[in-house]
């Protein structure tokens, strides 16, 4: 991804449609503490898309070489995407944050309990998410 001429698509909400994916590319590029890596990576970005759907579209339309995204995209679109794992030293791990209001109804509480169950973990794994 740092070699000149590689075409990369990234998700960048620009304050409009920020998601957990916004800026992840900077975490990957700068993970080893080298500003030169961030600079080289930045020079290869051809699209800063707002949201993963727009990123997917841009990746296809630009005939890009790489798209920094979450594991569910290549799993659910394996007819057009290939997942390529990056070096372990650059891997970024994110959690799924869930907040339950003190006034939440019982169904919300049940759903949260379900999310941490073995059954839910098996479902999440089918989309590439691990706990």
Map each language-model feature to its residues:
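Exported/periplasmic ABC-transporter solute-binding proteins
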Residues: 2-131
């Amino acid at each position: 991804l740092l070699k000149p001429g590689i075409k990369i698509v990234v998700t960048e909400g620009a304050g409009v449609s920020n998601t957990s994916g916004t800026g992840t590319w900077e975490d990957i590029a700068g993970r080893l503490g080298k500003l030169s890596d961030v600079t080289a990576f930045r020079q290869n970005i051809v699209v800063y898309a707002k949201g993963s759907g727009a990123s997917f579209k841009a990746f296809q339309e630009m005939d890009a070489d790489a798209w920094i995204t979450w594991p569910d995209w290549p799993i659910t679109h394996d007819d057009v995407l290939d997942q390529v794992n990056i070096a372990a030293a650059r891997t970024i791990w994110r959690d799924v944050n869930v907040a339950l209001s003190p006034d939440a109804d019982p169904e919300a509480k049940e759903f949260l309990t379900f999310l941490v169950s073995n059954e839910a973990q098996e479902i999440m794994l089918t989309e590439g998410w691990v706990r």
